[in-house]
């Protein structure tokens, strides 16, 4: 397994991983700023979080002495993101039940 990882590292440099992560983050940020549907905005935020996870794992893999710390932090971030999505989608569902819309522009008041 270690030999396979070393072969992949020889083929794909750190800049390749960082470029993919930057593109993922940019797409997520663009979608979160442009789209008005709350569910799509949540998906874009998750894409941004996964771009950060990719960066963290790439640096942990390429830096000597990092060990499995990058993967450990990534698992923690994924667990926190799952909880964030559960709470966020519950809020969106509650808003949809009262307002009959998930459009962010139409839900601008905190009153019921």
From Swiss-Prot:
NDH-1 shuttles electrons from NADH, via FMN and iron-sulfur (Fe-S) centers, to quinones in the respiratory chain. The immediate electron acceptor for the enzyme in this species is believed to be a menaquinone. Couples the redox reaction to proton translocation (for every two electrons transferred, four hydrogen ions are translocated across the cytoplasmic membrane), and thus conserves the redox energy in a proton gradient. Keywords: Cell membrane, Membrane, NAD, Quinone, Translocase, Transmembrane, Transmembrane helix, Transport. PANTHER family: NADH-UBIQUINONE OXIDOREDUCTASE CHAIN 4L, NADH-UBIQUINONE OXIDOREDUCTASE SUBUNIT ND4L. Its EC number is 7.1.1.-. It comes from Rubrobacter xylanophilus (strain DSM 9941 / JCM 11954 / NBRC 16129 / PRD-1). It is a multi-pass membrane protein. GO terms for molecular function: NADH:ubiquinone reductase (non-electrogenic) activity; quinone binding. The chain crosses the membrane at residues 14-34, 39-59, 76-96. It is found in: Cell membrane. One of its GO terms (cellular component) is plasma membrane. NDH-1 is composed of 14 different subunits. Subunits NuoA, H, J, K, L, M, N constitute the membrane sector of the complex. Belongs to the complex I subunit 4L family. Disulfide bonds: none annotated. It comes from the Bacteria. It is an enzyme of class 7 (translocase). This is NADH-quinone oxidoreductase subunit K. The keyword Manganese does not apply. Pfam families: Oxidored_q2. GO terms for biological process: ATP synthesis coupled electron transport. It catalyses: a quinone + NADH + 5 H(+)(in) = a quinol + NAD(+) + 4 H(+)(out).
């Amino acid at each position: 397994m270690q030999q396979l990882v070393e072969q992949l590292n020889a083929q794909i440099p750190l800049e390749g991983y960082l470029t993919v992560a930057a593109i993922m983050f940019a797409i997520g940020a663009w979608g979160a700023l442009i789209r008005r549907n709350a569910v799509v905005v949540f998906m874009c935020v998750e894409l941004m979080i996964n771009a950060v996870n990719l960066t963290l794992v790439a640096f942990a893999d390429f830096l000597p002495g990092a060990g499995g710390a990058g993967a450990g932090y990534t698992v923690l971030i994924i667990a926190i993101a799952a909880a964030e999505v559960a709470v966020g989608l519950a809020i969106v569902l509650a808003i949809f039940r009262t307002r009959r819309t998930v459009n962010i522009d139409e839900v601008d008041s905190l009153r019921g």
